[in-house]
């Protein structure tokens, strides 16, 4: 039992380290882009500090999203939780709301297309049977 818990803890730590490395890499790439665009330099310590702050903020976001869903007596985080998280940044909230509405519209269109295809399929399956009846009457 104790070995399983230790192994699980090691896996969790390893996973967290990989996530941190991915965040660090992404922050480094973004800093490089900004450095080229603005003709400035970022030290390795600055990139590391931005990476650590970003990772901690993401942890806080994850905890907040879990709490929002739990408060609503849900086990799944939804777009309303994300909007609630972004409420302090008007531009981010607007962007998320616009994207959410865009996705909802796309989903509605896909549903309508599926429904139309299924209706067309059922009409096509009826037509040959009806045609057969007409032919046999002549």
Swiss-Prot record:
Superkingdom, taxonomy of origin: Eukaryota
Molecular function GO terms recorded: chromatin binding; DNA binding; protein heterodimerization activity
Annotated positions of the N-acetylmethionine modification: 1
Keywords noted in UniProt: Acetylation, Cell cycle, Cell division, Centromere, Chromosome, DNA damage, DNA repair, DNA-binding, Kinetochore, Mitosis, Nucleus
Subcellular compartments: Nucleus; Chromosome, Centromere; Chromosome, Centromere, Kinetochore
Major location category of this protein: nucleus
Annotated protein name in UniProt: Centromere protein S
Native organism: Homo sapiens
UniProt gene name: CENPS
